């Protein structure tokens, strides 16, 4: 007789969890070549992001809220770093190596790109928060940094920082004290190619090095959680 209430409770929890998941939006950006789940359609804000070597780079922030929880993906286009820092180096004082850079690395644009993830990590560490985790990690085999911080108001921020095709991705989910970590948000980040098609690599991807071969696409029913951008056309070779 005691089994029935337990089964009913389990069913209620399962249905509630399913309904909660269904409320989230599977978002895809062809412009910034990523996919991610948000609680609602994210707001898109264009900003300027100043890099370590002071290049003012174009960036977008995709943000959404659910109650007291906040979610965002910031995408910074480091493909512009070479042009911006090379031009900036032309006006550097004579002999100012930290500004001039070197031949082929004017304005230290190469270092700016290579150090982008660490610089972004440092910006998070400087917040009024206690760092509780800082590790190397991957999302769909694209390497990056993963962080957890406890903020001054006891809320917790779960962050991931990744670099793909010279674009920096800073993903942050902040939840009130006592709330579970935002796994539905964190684990949904994915990558798109130039045609808006979801991609995954066969082994680790490190920005700045030749990309590894891509994994063969499994049928949709076998690879849940990864979507293509609207209107994407999948090449038969990718299937």
Where are these regions (language model features)?
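Conserved polar/disulfide-associated segments of primarily extracytoplasmic proteins
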Residues: 50-160, 228-239
């Amino acid at each position: 007789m005691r089994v029935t209430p337990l089964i009913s409770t389990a069913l209620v929890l399962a249905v509630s969890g399913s309904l909660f998941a269904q409320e989230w939006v599977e978002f895809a950006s062809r412009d910034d070549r990523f996919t991610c789940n948000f609680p609602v359609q994210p707001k898109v804000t264009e900003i300027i992001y100043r890099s370590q070597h002071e290049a003012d780079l174009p960036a977008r922030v995709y943000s959404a809220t659910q109650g007291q929880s906040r979610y965002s993906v910031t995408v910074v286009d480091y493909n512009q770093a070479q042009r911006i820092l090379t031009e900036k180096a032309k006006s550097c004082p004579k002999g100012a190596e930290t500004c001039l850079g070197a031949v082929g690395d004017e304005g230290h644009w190469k270092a700016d790109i290579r150090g982008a993830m660490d610089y972004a990590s440092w910006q998070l560490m400087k917040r009024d928060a206690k760092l509780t985790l800082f590790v190397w990690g991957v999302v769909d085999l694209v390497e990056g940094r993963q962080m957890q911080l406890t903020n001054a108001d006891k809320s917790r921020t779960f962050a991931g920082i990744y670099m793909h095709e010279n674009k920096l991705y800073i993903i942050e989910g902040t939840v009130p004290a006592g709330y579970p970590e935002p796994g539905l948000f964190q684990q949904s980040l994915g990558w798109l190619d130039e045609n808006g098609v979801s991609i995954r690599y066969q082994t680790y991807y490190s920005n700045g090095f030749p990309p590894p071969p891509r994994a063969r696409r499994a049928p949709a029913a076998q690879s849940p959680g990864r979507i293509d951008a609207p209107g994407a056309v999948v090449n038969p070779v990718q299937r």
